[in-house]
């Protein structure tokens, strides 16, 4: 089956350089979709792209975040579908060597049979979005870089704190296009999350990492959670008195499946896109960052597999982390191979040459050239600092050390 692909993100929490959307494939914010409406229609989209810009309406309002994974409501009673590996931590939490849901799978025949998800599991339902760009950036252009950074960070924290004064909600001030835009995202934080279904590894991990990140796939890569809230609809901790959350919107699964050439669009919360990075950043990514990280992940995976043999109780406890590491390593390896195959660095270099020629062709654009040169220099400085941070961040990855570090940081933040 060969389907036309286009990835549309419900929210991009990260940074990128601003540029018009032009490619048929790739990752876009919903606000960009009307800009490529003709291309979407040609590819097979039957909906009005403008309808996809409302993240609290249908259908985008059915898409939720698990804090690190995307998911969707698929019933009026809070049933949520996500990827198998996204629920793996909860399956692992409820498994033992004697009662191994990872190996055998799990199905709750009734709501009463559903299992509490792993501690800390959350479902975030976006309820409101507000443009706060002016409030965050006002007066910062005249500041020094250090003062500008401090001011923006403090304003983002202040706005977040104001938003979270309402119980049951978590808020985030997301940066877009390298700080050109800021959006306040208000989300209901569902804290009572229960496991409904997870496939056995023979289904959910069929093909192992050979099939992962590739198409076509033959894996049953899905699992179900259910969101629960207090009887009054507010967010609440786990309680037998809680009731299934009634989402404003949910998606219906098309049992007919796909036909060859069908249009496919995926909406989710992937974190960030690097579509608009400069040549210097692309080179650093594929010459150092990705290869170094891939090597580190490979060593980490080998260490876990050696010290926690297959079938041991230790392996059960490490399964979720091992799956995540393999998932990430395969992704990095694929990106490195793909970039080399398509000549990404050379293509990006040619694009920047074309941009330089376009600037040079008109005196009115002359101010752009020094700005781009300054950006390239800053990219090199940033890459140097990032390498130091890379090793620091990974040196503190062990679970106990990471937890201790986070607790210490949070205790200090409470003092401020």
Language model feature labels by segment:
Residues 2-4, 11-14, 18-416:
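Terminal presequence/propeptide segments associated with secretion/organelle targeting
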